[in-house]
Amino acid sequence: IFGVRAKKKLLMQIIVASLLPMSYLYINNLYGFLGIYEIPPLVGAVLTVGVLVFIMNAINLIDGIDGLSASLTLIALAGLFFIFQRERIWVYCILIAGLMGVLIPFLYHNIWGKQEKNQKIFMGDSGSLTLGYILGVLLIKFCMYNPHVMPYQKGATLLSVTLLLVPTFDVFRVIIVRILHQKPIFRADKNHIHHKLMRAGMTQHQALISIIALSLIFIIINLSLFNQ
């Protein structure tokens, strides 16, 4: 999104994120995460907006090399698809399957497409923010306790964090480093995990595979332990 300042982007993100609690879709239970269970609606609404804005920016900020943002989103969607199909919530399964079907050909052209043959496509801010928004909505839907839709999911909050563990920790680390060095939080830099791996000698594809493998390991372990 060219020509739009970071603060204006953030304001628009807050506005669109506010649509969720206005539609009565918000985080109302942390399932024991940090010792917290049921939370008041007002607190849940504010938390929902904050979480959704964070996820949108996490997916956007980690989009630094070809295929990374889309790959991590695809992995998280696969985890959510497993959860929703297990609970037989087919509406969300259809949404996830459709989005995964879009991402797979995109990844092919984004990673292996030849720019000189006009075969390479890019995501940009609009694409990564949209992916982050949809992914955030699905995660919040999973975290919201509604006994009429889904039974009590012990560990739902922790599993949701795991699905986006790599972009979550990467954003936290980058923000902390920028604050410590008194740099603007919204200014782009080359301090993300993929930049670190490439400076260590990896190629773009090696860094991509390493980050995907790390994310997959955490997600598979937590999914196998979920509700056991």
Give the location of each predicted region.
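Alpha-helical transmembrane segments
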Residues: 68-228
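Intramembrane alpha-helical segments
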Residues: 1-91, 101-113, 212-222, 227-228
